[in-house]
């Protein structure tokens, strides 16, 4: 999971999600 939070990206479980 790629999560964007305050301009930062986190990859988790190979999926992509955008937050904020």
From Swiss-Prot:
Keyword Ribonucleoprotein: no
EC number: 1.11.1.24
Catalytically driven reaction(s): a hydroperoxide + [thioredoxin]-dithiol = an alcohol + [thioredoxin]-disulfide + H2O
Coiled-coil regions, chain positions: none
Keywords: Antioxidant, Oxidoreductase, Peroxidase
Top EC category: oxidoreductase
GO molecular function (one): thioredoxin-dependent peroxiredoxin activity
Extra information: On the 2D-gel the determined pI of this protein is: 4.6, its MW is: 20.2 kDa.
Family membership: Belongs to the peroxiredoxin family. Tpx subfamily.
Record's function text: Thiol-specific peroxidase that catalyzes the reduction of hydrogen peroxide and organic hydroperoxides to water and alcohols, respectively. Plays a role in cell protection against oxidative stress by detoxifying peroxides.
Subunit record text: Homodimer.
Name of this chain's protein: Thiol peroxidase
Species name: Clostridium pasteurianum
């Amino acid at each position: 999971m790629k999560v964007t939070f305050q301009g930062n990206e986190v990859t988790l479980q190979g999926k992509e999600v955008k937050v904020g």
